[in-house]
A protein has these predicted regions:
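A glycine-rich helix N-cap at a beta->alpha junction
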Residues: 90-107
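Glycine-rich phosphate/adenosyl-contacting loop at the front of the ribokinase-like
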Residues: 1-75, 93
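Short beta-strand scaffold segments in enzyme catalytic cores
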Residues: 111-114
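Short secondary-structure boundary micro-motifs
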Residues: 5, 85, 96-100
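Short, basic and Ser/Thr-rich N-terminal targeting/leader segments
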Residues: 68, 107-109
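Glycine- and other small-residue-rich loops at beta-strand/loop junctions that grip anionic moieties
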Residues: 76-77, 102
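Short, electropositive alpha-helical surface patch
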Residues: 80, 84-93
Length: 114
């Protein structure tokens, strides 16, 4: 491994929404809002997930470096849940050596709704 990144393992959950959904949920276009687990579950219950992608700024950077032909790794923490497995699979697909400890606590893998 030539390059190692350490960061937050966050699954990007891509969803298509209309203006009505944004208004109903007090969301504003082109902004970021921190929400808790209960609110994310509530939002996801009214959405159709288009795709899930391994994300987080450091992971995105090492994926880019991998695509340029570098041998890379990433250290992050995911939960032992469905999203944690998708995160791991996504990095493996991009040839990133994912060095992690799966957390078995009730806290879910970090998620970003896009």
């Amino acid at each position: 491994m030539k390059i190692l990144g350490i960061g937050n393992a966050i699954v990007d959950v891509l969803c298509k929404v209309d203006d009505e959904f944004l208004i109903k949920n007090s969301l504003t276009k082109s902004t970021m809002k921190l929400i808790d687990e209960a609110e994310i579950k509530n939002l996801l219950s009214g959405l159709t997930i288009q795709d899930t992608i391994s994300g987080g700024s450091v992971a995105n950077s090492v994926v880019g470096l991998s695509q340029l032909g570098n041998r890379v790794g990433f250290i992050g923490k995911v939960n032992d849940d469905n999203l944690g497995q998708k995160y791991e699979d996504g990095l493996k697909k991009e040839k990133v050596n994912f060095l992690y400890k799966k957390n078995s606590e009730s806290t879910p893998t970090g998620t970003c709704l896009i």
